[in-house]
Amino acid sequence: MKDYKKYYPLSAPPDEVYEALTKADKIEMWTGETAEMSQNSDTEFSLWDGSIVGKNLEFDPGKKIVQHWYFGDQSPASIVTLILHPHKQGTSVELTHTNIPDEDYEDIVQGWNESYFGSLQEFYS
């Protein structure tokens, strides 16, 4: 298992970025794919038309999102934490993704950089 941490700058305020990460209609705007998302803890989510699935664990509006990402029946859980920091250019998103299966690590990192945050950065450019 591996962990990944990185900061991503976005040119939008934290409250706006939070909405873009937690509301299905907003997610669909920057991904171009079907999304199922709730801002309630203990709910399932699906992104990129089911390519990413998991469970929402914790929300602190405008500040923090914690999710369990599913990789089959993997144990321990793969946890994604997004902390939104105000930044002079908008928001700096602190991503921490723990317990990534070794065989999925490179694909996950590429997905974060190109698909997930790459799409968000392009959306806000």
PLM region spans:
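Short, flexible helix/strand-to-coil boundary loops that buttress conserved ligand/catalytic motifs
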Residues: 21, 31, 60, 69, ...
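Hydrophobic ligand-binding cavity/cleft-lining segments
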Residues: 1-36
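Hydrophobic-ligand binding "helix-grip"
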Residues: 28, 36-39, 43-100
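Conserved short-loop catalytic and cofactor-binding motifs
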Residues: 5, 33, 44, 96, ...
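A conserved amphipathic terminal alpha-helix motif
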Residues: 99-125
